Design a protein with these regions (language model features):
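Interfacial segments of transmembrane alpha-helices in multi-pass membrane proteins
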Residues: 2-4, 400-401, 405-420, 424-425, ...
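Interfacial helix-loop-helix hairpins and adjacent transmembrane helices
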Residues: 1-21, 26-63, 67, 87-101, ...
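Pore- and gate-forming transmembrane helices of large, multi-pass membrane proteins
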Residues: 177, 485-505, 557, 577-613, ...
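Hydrophobic alpha-helical transmembrane segments of membrane transport and translocation systems
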Residues: 8, 527, 534-535, 571-592, ...
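Non-transmembrane, solvent-exposed regions of membrane trafficking/translocation machinery
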Residues: 22-28, 49, 65-75, 81-429, ...
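Cytosolic juxtamembrane regions of multi-pass inner-membrane proteins
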Residues: 556-600, 643-651, 873, 879-941, ...
Length: 1005
C-alpha cells in the first residue's frame, strides 16, 4: 500500500485531537460531579471558578468546548426571529404619502409571499413600473441616509444604500439579541444569521425554563440611552453607610443619615475595604479562605465584602464585583433600605462586559447614573443617532465616530456643556457599554469616542450605537420549546437505539465474514465513531437526537465499505489468488465503487447542511463527518492492519466467510433484464396509485412546517381516547385576527407514545397575527378547554405551561411556525430535493461518462422518492405514529436519495468494469452477470442498514420514529429499484445507443 506513513500520521493526529477535545467533556462531567457534592451554592460556584483543567483551561472554557446537548436532549428554546425588511425601508423613506411609493410597497409585499426575489428587488422593480420616469432618490434622499443618498443619486446607488441599511439593521438586531441572551444567563447559546433568508436570525437556548420572559426579551425594541453620571467619590459614602446599616441588622430605614455623617465614616471604612480588596490583589473573584471566613466577612460587611469600592477618581465607576456576586449586590442596592439611604436620583447599572484587565476573572463594573429629567428617563435616546462607525484617529488609534440628527445634536451640545470633565454613560438595555469623559462641549452632532480601545472594541461600540436606531423590533416567526424531562427521555432512547444497533452490527459482521475480519471491521466502526465524536467536539457542535440518528446511520453505511471490500476479496480468492494478492486486488477493485457511493452521499449531505435548519443540520453534520471517517477507516486503516499481520502463519489461511455465508447467493444466474417490462408495468401502476392519492384523494398530512401553526405536546392527568380530546378542542380555537377572523381554527389531535396520556395538539389559531401576546393567549385557550374537559387538573395556566410539573397535566414541548417561514420551508424542500437529483445526475454523467447510467439513477431515485411520499399519503391516520410531512421528513427523503444512490453506483461500477473486461459481450448478459455478482453485497448492505434503522424505529422514540420509517421504506424500495429500475433503464438507453451506433456503422460500410 502506498502512502502508508501518511495514513498512519493522519490516524495518529486524528486520535490525539479526538482525545484532546473529548477530554473536555470528561473534565466538565467530573467537575460537575465534584461541585454537586458541595451544598452551599456560593461555595459550589467558587469551586467551579477556581478549577483549571490541565492547569490552563478554566471551567467555563471546558463547558464551551465539550460536546453540548441540543434542545431536544437537554430541553430549551429554539426561535427564528425576523426583522421586517419592509419596515426598515419604510423608516428610511421620505414622502411616505407618495402614491407611487405606497403602491410599489403594497405590490412588493404581496409578491414577496410567492416570489423567490428579495423584497428590495421587488420594491425597486415595482416602483420603476409604476413611476417609470421618476428616481428613487426623490423618496430616499433623507436625513437618515445623509452621506449615502442625495437628490442626484442614481437608482443603483439608492438600491445599494437600502441594502446596506437592511444589512446594518440585521447586524444590529444580532448584537442586541446576543447581548440580551448573555444578560439572561443562557449557557452555550447558538445565535446565527440564516443564509439565504434575509432578515432572519436563529437562536438556540438550551436549558431555558421561562419561555414567556424570553419571548418578551427577544421581541422588545432596543433601548439605547445616554445618561449623565455621578462621580464615584460622590456615591461611595452612601454605599459605605448602606453597608454599615446592613451590618447592624437594619432592613428598613425611617430616616436618611446626612451625607456629612456618612462622609465622616468614609475614611475608616474605605481603608478597611481597600486593604482587603485591592484592585491589584490577585485573589479578586477567586475562592479565598474557608466558608467560615467568607461568612464572617459578609456578616461584617454585607455589601462591601462582595462589592469593592473604586479608589481615587474613577468617574462613574463606583465599584467592582465578580459576576457570581452581581445578583447578591442587586438584591441589596434595590432593597427598601437602599431606597432610603441612596440618593433618589441615582441609578446603579452594571457594565455590559468585564472590566479591562479583569476579563479572565469576570469582574464587572458598577456605574452610577444620574436622573436629570422629571419623568426619570434618560435625557437622550438612541433614536437621534443617524450613523456610527469604527475608524482610526490621526495617530492611528481606534476610535468611534457618532453622528446625530439636528434634535439630537442640540440636546447633545447641552449635555456635554453641562458635564465637562464628567462621564456620560452609553447604556443599551440597562447595561453600560462605555462611559467616556467629556473633554469639551460638542456641537454640530458629530462626536468621536476614544480611549484604550482595541479594533474589536470599536466595532462592538459602533454596533451598539447603531442598535439604538433599529427601525423595527424583531418578531418570532418560528419557535420550539422542549421541556428538560422530555430531553432526558430522548437521551435514554437515543443511547439505547445506538447501543443495540452497534451490538447487532458487530454480531452480523462476525457471522458473515468470520471472527478476525468481522472484528477488524467492528474495530473500524469503533474508530469511525471515535473520530466522528472527536471532530464534533472540535467544532463545538451540539449533539441532537437527529445527530445521534446520523451517527447510528453512519454505522450502517460504514459497514457498506467493509462489505464491498470483503466481497471483492472473496471473489479474488475464489479465482485462485492467495491471501496477499486477493487483499490487494480486493481493496483496489472496491475503491472506485466505495469512492463514488460515498461521494454521492456527500452531495446529499451537503445539500441537507446548506438548506436545512436546526435538527436537520445536526443530522447532516454528523452524517457528513461519519461518511468521511468511515471512508478513511474502512479503506485505509483496515488495509494497513491486514498487510501488517500477513506475516503471521495463521493469517495466511484467513477466510472471509463462515459456514453460513460460504455459499450464500453464490453462482446466481437470474436474468433480471428479462423482467423489465413486468417491473416497469408494476412500477407505473404503483406510481399512478400514489400520485392519485397525493394529488386527488388523500393528499398529505402536512405539519405546521408547511402550513404554519402551533404544536403542543401535552401530558394529561389520565389515559384518554384521542377522539374525546378532539371533541373538546374542536371549537375551542376561534380566530380573532386576519382573513379568518370569527372562523374556527384548524385543530388536530394525535396520540403519542404507548402510555395513553400524551397527545400532540396542532392548530393554526391566529397564526397570521404579529402580536407577541398571541402565544400566551393560545396556551390559555388550550388550558381552559382541557381543564373544562377534565383532562388537566393544574390550578392555573402558569403551572400548565411548566414542563417540570407533570402531575396534573402540562405542556412538555411546543413549537410555532409562522406563515412566511412555512412558505420558505416549502420552497426550500422542493429546491433541496431537486438539487440533489440534479447534482447526482451530473456527477454520475461525469464519473461514468455515459448518459444511460445518469438517466437510470435519476429515474430510480425519483421513483424511490415518490414511493416513500406515497406511502405517507396512503397510510397516515391508519398507523399508530405520526406520518406528517415536516422538515425531518424532507431530511429523510434526501437521506434516502443519498443511500439509494450508493447501491446503484455499486451495481453500475461493476457494469462499467465488466464492459471493459468483456467489450464484445452482449449487454443483456453483461447486465445480468453484473447484478448477480453484486447481489450478495446488495443484500448484506441493505440488511445491515435495516438492522440499524429498525433499532432507531423501535427504540428511538416519537421524535425520530417517522424519520426511521421513511428510511426503512427508502432502503427497501431503493434496493429493489437498483435492480429492477435503474439497471434496466440504463440497459435500454445503452442498448439503444449501441444499436444506433452499429446501424450507422453498417450504413457507412
Amino acid at each position: 500500500m502506498q502512502n502508508k506513513g501518511l495514513v498512519i500520521c493522519v490516524a495518529v493526529l486524528l486520535t490525539l485531537a479526538s482525545i484532546f477535545y473529548l477530554s473536555f467533556s470528561v473534565a466538565t462531567s467530573y467537575y460537575d460531579g465534584q461541585a454537586a457534592k458541595i451544598k452551599d451554592p456560593i461555595a459550589r460556584q467558587d469551586y467551579k471558578d477556581s478549577v483549571k483543567y490541565l492547569g490552563i483551561y478554566p471551567y467555563q472554557k471546558c463547558l464551551e468546548t465539550q460536546i453540548g446537548l441540543g434542545l431536544d436532549l437537554k430541553g430549551g428554546m429554539n426561535v427564528i426571529l425576523e426583522i421586517s425588511v419592509p419596515d426598515v425601508v419604510d423608516v428610511l423613506a421620505d414622502h411616505k404619502t407618495d402614491a407611487a411609493y405606497q403602491k410599489a410597497m403594497k405590490e412588493a409585499k404581496a409578491q414577496e409571499a410567492t416570489s423567490q426575489s428579495d423584497f428590495i428587488t421587488l420594491f425597486v422593480d415595482n416602483f420603476h413600473k409604476i413611476a417609470p420616469g421618476r428616481k428613487l432618490a426623490e423618496i430616499f434622499a433623507t436625513q437618515q441616509l445623509k452621506g449615502k443618498v442625495s437628490t442626484q443619486s442614481s437608482d443603483k446607488e439608492v438600491e445599494k444604500a437600502l441594502r446596506e441599511e437592511v444589512a446594518a439593521s440585521i447586524d444590529n438586531s444580532y448584537n442586541v439579541v446576543r447581548n440580551r441572551i448573555d444578560q439572561f444567563g443562557v449557557v452555550q447559546p447558538n445565535i446565527q444569521k440564516l443564509e439565504g433568508q434575509e432578515g432572519r436570525l436563529m437562536v438556540e437556548m438550551p436549558g431555558i425554563r421561562e419561555p414567556e420572559r424570553m419571548r418578551k426579551l427577544l421581541q422588545g425594541s432596543a433601548n439605547l440611552e445616554f445618561w449623565e453620571t455621578y462621580n464615584n467619590q460622590e456615591i461611595a459614602p452612601y454605599l459605605t453607610q448602606l453597608d454599615q446599616r446592613l451590618a447592624n441588622g437594619e432592613t428598613k430605614a425611617e430616616t436618611k443619615d446626612s451625607v456629612t455623617n456618612a462622609t465622616n465614616k468614609k475614611q475608616v471604612t474605605e481603608k478597611k475595604t481597600t486593604t482587603k480588596l485591592s484592585l491589584k490583589d490577585d485573589n479578586i473573584g477567586e475562592n479565598v479562605g474557608s466558608n467560615a471566613q467568607m461568612a464572617a466577612a459578609r456578616k461584617e460587611h454585607p455589601l462591601l465584602s462582595i462589592l469593592q469600592l473604586t479608589p481615587g477618581d474613577a468617574l462613574s465607576v463606583v465599584g467592582y464585583a465578580s459576576v457570581r456576586d452581581t445578583a447578591a449586590v442587586n438584591k441589596i442596592i434595590y432593597s427598601k433600605l437602599a431606597q432610603q439611604v441612596l440618593p433618589s436620583d441615582l441609578r446603579l447599572r452594571w457594565s455590559a462586559k468585564p472590566a479591562d484587565g479583569l476579563k479572565q476573572k469576570n469582574i464587572f463594573e458598577l456605574h452610577a447614573l444620574k436622573v436629570t429629567t422629571s419623568d426619570g428617563r434618560a435625557p437622550l435616546e438612541g433614536d437621534v443617532i443617524t450613523d456610527a462607525k469604527d475608524q482610526f484617529d490621526q495617530y492611528g488609534r481606534p476610535e468611534v465616530s457618532m453622528t446625530m440628527n439636528s434634535d439630537g445634536a442640540r440636546q447633545w451640545a447641552a449635555i456635554t456643556k453641562a458635564n465637562l470633565g464628567k462621564a456620560v454613560a452609553i447604556v443599551l438595555d440597562g447595561l453600560v457599554y462605555t462611559a467616556p469623559r467629556i473633554n469639551s462641549e460638542i456641537t454640530g452632532g458629530s462626536s468621536s469616542i476614544s480611549g484604550s480601545f482595541t479594533i474589536e472594541d470599536t466595532k462592538d461600540l459602533a454596533n451598539t450605537l447603531k442598535s439604538g436606531r433599529m427601525p423595527a423590533p424583531a418578531r418570532i416567526v418560528q419557535e420550539e420549546v422542549v421541556g428538560p424531562t422530555l430531553g432526558a427521555q430522548s437521551i435514554q432512547q437515543g443511547l439505547w437505539s445506538f447501543a443495540i444497533a452497534f451490538v447487532l452490527l458487530m454480531i452480523y459482521m462476525v457471522i458473515m465474514y468470520d471472527v478476525i475480519p468481522g472484528m477488524l471491521a467492528n474495530c473500524a466502526l469503533l474508530a469511525n465513531l471515535f473520530f466522528t465524536l472527536g471532530i464534533l467536539a472540535s467544532f463545538q457542535s451540539a449533539l441532537t437526537m437527529p445527530g445521534i440518528a446520523g451517527i447510528v446511520l453512519t454505522l450502517g453505511t460504514a459497514v457498506d465499505a467493509n462489505v464491498l471490500i470483503y466481497e471483492r476479496i472473496k471473489e479474488e480468492m475464489r479465482a485462485g489468488k492467495g491471501i496477499k494478492d486477493a487483499l490487494q486486488a480486493g481493496y483496489s477493485n472496491a475503491f472506485s465503487a466505495i469512492f463514488d457511493s460515498n461521494f454521492t452521499s456527500l452531495i446529499t449531505g451537503i445539500i441537507l447542511l446548506v438548506t436545512g435548519t436546526g435538527p436537520i443540520r445536526g443530522f447532516a453534520t454528523t452524517w457528513i463527518i461519519g461518511i468521511i471517517c468511515s471512508f478513511f477507516t474502512a479503506v485505509y486503516l483496515t488495509r494497513i492492519v491486514f498487510e501488517n499481520r500477513l506475516g503471521k502463519d495463521k493469517w495466511l489461511n484467513q477466510k472471509f466467510y463462515t459456514s453460513i455465508s460460504k455459499n450464500l447467493m453464490r453462482n446466481m444466474h437470474i436474468k433480471f433484464m428479462s423482467f423489465y417490462k413486468t417491473t416497469f408495468t408494476i412500477s407505473a401502476i404503483v406510481a399512478v396509485v400514489f400520485l392519485v392519492s397525493i394529488f386527488f384523494v388523500r393528499g398529505l398530512s402536512k405539519s405546521i412546517d408547511f402550513t404554519g401553526g402551533r404544536n403542543y405536546v401535552i401530558t394529561l392527568n389520565k389515559k384518554v381516547h384521542v377522539e374525546d380530546v378532539r371533541k373538546v378542542l374542536n371549537n375551542a380555537f376561534v380566530n380573532t385576527t386576519g382573513e379568518n377572523a370569527g372562523k374556527p381554527a384548524t385543530t388536530t389531535v394525535i396520540a403519542l407514545g404507548t402510555e395513553g396520556n400524551t397527545i400532540r395538539v396542532s392548530t393554526n389559531y391566529n397564526i397570521e397575527s404579529n402580536d407577541p401576546a398571541e402565544d400566551d393567549h393560545a396556551e390559555t385557550v388550550l388550558y381552559n378547554a382541557l381543564k373544562k374537559g377534565g383532562f388537566v387538573s393544574q390550578a392555573n395556566v402558569e403551572k400548565f405551561k411548566d414542563p417540570d410539573i407533570r402531575e396534573g397535566g402540562s405542556i412538555i414541548s411546543s413549537s410555532k411556525v409562522g406563515p412566511s417561514v412555512a412558505k420558505d420551508i416549502t420552497h426550500g424542500a422542493i429546491r433541496s430535493v431537486a438539487l440533489a437529483l440534479i447534482f447526482i445526475f451530473i456527477y454520475i454523467l461525469v464519473r461514468f461518462r455515459n448518459l444511460g447510467f445518469s438517466v437510470g439513477s435519476v429515474v430510480a431515485l425519483a421513483l424511490d422518492t415518490l414511493i416513500v411520499i406515497g406511502f405517507y399519503s396512503v397510510c397516515y391516520g391508519w398507523i399508530g405514529f405520526s406520518l406528517e410531512i415536516d422538515q425531518t421528513f424532507i431530511g429523510a427523503i434526501l437521506t434516502v436519495i443519498g443511500y439509494s444512490i450508493n447501491d446503484k453506483v455499486v451495481v453500475f461500477d461493476r457494469i462499467r468494469e465488466n464492459m471493459k473486461l468483456h467489450p464484445k459481450q452482449d449487454y443483456q448478459t453483461l447486465f445480468n452477470d453484473s447484478i448477480n455478482q453484486t447481489l450478495t453485497r446488495t443484500i448484506n448492505t441493505s440488511f445491515s442498514t435495516l438492522i440499524v434503522l429498525l433499532s432507531i424505529f423501535i427504540l428511538g422514540g416519537d421524535s425520530i420514529r417517522s424519520f426511521a420509517f421513511a428510511m426503512i421504506l427508502g432502503v427497501f424500495f431503493g434496493t429493489l429499484s437498483s435492480i429492477f429500475i435503474a439497471s434496466p433503464v440504463a440497459y435500454l438507453v445503452l442498448g439503444k445507443k449501441t444499436e444506433n451506433r452499429l446501424k450507422n456503422k453498417s450504413e457507412k460500410e
